Curated annotation (Swiss-Prot):
Organism this protein belongs to: Cyanothece sp. (strain PCC 7425 / ATCC 29141)
Similarity annotation: Belongs to the endoribonuclease YbeY family.
NCBIfam families: rRNA maturation RNase YbeY
Keyword Ligase: no
Function text: Single strand-specific metallo-endoribonuclease involved in late-stage 70S ribosome quality control and in maturation of the 3' terminus of the 16S rRNA.
Name this polypeptide is given: Endoribonuclease YbeY
Free-text cofactor note: Binds 1 zinc ion.
UniProt gene name: ybeY
GO BP terms in the entry: rRNA processing
Length: 169
């Protein structure tokens, strides 16, 4: 089983350059999937969309979907949470997990403030979004702490240093 990643580069107005190749994203998501897939419905393969964008687009999405008219770092739209009538999953079909949208502008600012690389920040945000696609949430401090610890595990699994958790709480 594997995860196919539809990588969309939509950060043309951003001043930051994404230091992560498409193949690296694919490797990371597949490694994270290996660690977390037992909780997913069975399928022959899985897919997700990762959209790297700028503050303008993510602010528009954040306003429309969350009624918060400002940029944010990451949004996740989990396909498995959508309440639509569907038949039981067919193990021979591709299962779409959802979409992750990351503002490269906000990630750049957060990496500078947290004194870690843009690569680490983008991976951290992608891991956070990926967990949301798999059903994780953080409605309270205890669940947020658990989710942040899981993100640390995911970053370590792909050989990235763990940013200081205090900068994310």
């Amino acid at each position: 089983m594997q995860v196919d990643v539809d990588l969309q580069d939509a950060y043309s107005s951003s001043t930051a350059q994404v230091p992560i190749a498409a193949e690296t994203w694919l490797t990371w998501f597949n490694r994270w999937f290996e660690l977390l897939h037992p909780s997913l419905p069975p399928a022959c393969s899985y897919e997700l969309c990762l959209r790297l964008t700028d503050d303008g687009e993510i602010a528009s999405l954040n306003s429309f979907y969350r009624q918060q008219p400002q940029p944010t770092d990451v949004l996740a739209f989990a396909a498995l949470e959508v309440e639509v009538p569907r038949s039981p999953p067919d193990q021979t079909e591709l299962l779409h997990l959802g979409d992750i949208v990351i503002s490269v502008d906000t990630a750049q600012r957060q990496s500078l403030a947290g004194q870690h690389s843009l690569t680490v920040e983008l991976a951290w945000l992608a891991a956070h979004g990926f967990l949301h696609l798999l059903g994780w949430d953080h409605p309270d401090p205890a669940s947020l702490e658990q989710m942040l610890k899981q993100q640390s595990i995911l970053l370590a699994a792909v050989g990235l240093e763990n940013p200081a958790l205090e900068s994310f709480i």
